[in-house]
Each structure stands twice: as C-alpha cells, then as structure tokens.
Amino acid sequence: MLSTRKQNWGEDRVMFYDAQGRLRSLPASWTDVNEADLFSQVAAGRSFSRPDDLSALASLIDRIKRRQEE
C-alpha cells in the first residue's frame, strides 16, 4: 500500500509498507504512479529498462570503478 510520495535522496520516490510492516522506498519511475513515458508506451512491456535508466546505471558503475582504482 502506498504511504507517500516525495523528493528523497535527490529523486522522486514512493514510500510504502511491505508485508512485514517495514517502510520501504523505491524510485517513482520504477512504479506505475506516473503516466508511462513515451518510450515505455511504445515498448509496451518488451523492454526491461529505459535507455535513460541504463545510461544512469552505466555512469554509476563507472564512478564506482574509478573509486576502487584510487
């Protein structure tokens, strides 16, 4: 059950309680809270990830690798 939606950790997030009653948080873009963006509408469930999300993940992996090399 959705508890709240707010900006948290610099992004739009939804808060909900899981089956054990613990408060959980997910990026709103991972849910159906928003109307689907154009890519998601055209993909119609045939794509696991949006290109923007994959690009952000690649950037995150690069930053982690650079920190490990320091």
Curated annotation (Swiss-Prot):
Listed InterPro entries: DUF5372
Keywords assigned by UniProt, alphabetized: Plasmid
Superkingdom of the source species: Bacteria
Protein name: Uncharacterized protein y4oN
Organism listed in the record: Sinorhizobium fredii (strain NBRC 101917 / NGR234)
